[in-house]
Amino acid sequence: MAKGKDVRIPVLLECTACVRNGVNKESTGISRYITQKNRHNTPNRLELLKFCPYCYKHTIHGEIKK
């Protein structure tokens, strides 16, 4: 009964500041969030302002491929 592919797909968001800085020496990882996006409303890559526990501030988290 479903037509085509699902409209809402799960996406991974990764902290761009941690990736750009090569992960600060005192931090232990890279912040990642899982969320959903509607493929029809947002066909391009998703970017959201989220809190990064490794940078200790709100940074831009961009969509990455699985």
Swiss-Prot record:
Organism: Guizotia abyssinica (Niger)
Membrane-spanning segments: none
Gene: rpl33
Alphabetical keyword list: Chloroplast, Plastid, Ribonucleoprotein, Ribosomal protein
This protein's GO CC annotations: chloroplast; ribonucleoprotein complex; ribosome
Subcellular location: Plastid, Chloroplast
GO molecular function, a single term: structural constituent of ribosome
UniProt keyword annotation of Ion transport present: no
Taxonomy of the source species: Eukaryota, Viridiplantae, Streptophyta, Embryophyta, Tracheophyta
UniProt name for this protein: Large ribosomal subunit protein bL33c
Chief location bin: plastid
Keyword Plastid listed: yes
Similarity annotation: Belongs to the bacterial ribosomal protein bL33 family.
BP GO annotations: translation
